[in-house]
């Protein structure tokens, strides 16, 4: 998508700068729509909702580390201590939420991000976690 939600056809052979621009344009549009939905959920829910907003991957550019950087945002009403930490990965998001809201006892798993290439989909590589 373009920044206003318009359909965009990307040319074949786009370089990293072109992918970054296309990714930024998509994010601008998605941010606008996501905020509308989140405001609606919070404003019309009879009970404060738990909201998790996650991306499955970052920008699809040649820098593999960018591919592993995702959005991981939470709205967790009523909790004084969430247990969230800067290096959390999605594998532990729901475990913490179930433990905090529903009395679960799910142990946390290793926070790891795996990547594979299209031509070798089952050859996984562990990505370094560069979260601050």
Spans of features found by a protein language model:
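Catalytic domains that recognize anionic headgroups
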Residues: 1-132
């Amino acid at each position: 998508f373009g920044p206003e939600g318009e359909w965009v056809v990307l040319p074949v052979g786009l370089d990293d700068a072109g992918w970054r621009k296309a990714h930024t344009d998509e994010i601008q549009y998605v941010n606008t729509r996501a905020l509308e939905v989140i405001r609606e959920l919070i404003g019309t829910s009879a009970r404060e909702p738990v909201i998790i907003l996650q991306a499955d991957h970052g920008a699809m550019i040649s820098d593999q580390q960018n591919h592993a950087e995702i959005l991981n945002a939470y709205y967790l009403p009523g909790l004084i201590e969430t247990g969230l930490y800067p290096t959390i990965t999605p594998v532990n998001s729901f475990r913490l939420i179930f433990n905090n809201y529903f009395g679960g006892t799910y142990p946390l798993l290793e926070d790891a991000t795996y990547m594979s290439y299209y031509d070798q989909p089952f050859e996984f590589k562990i990505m370094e976690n560069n979260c601050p």
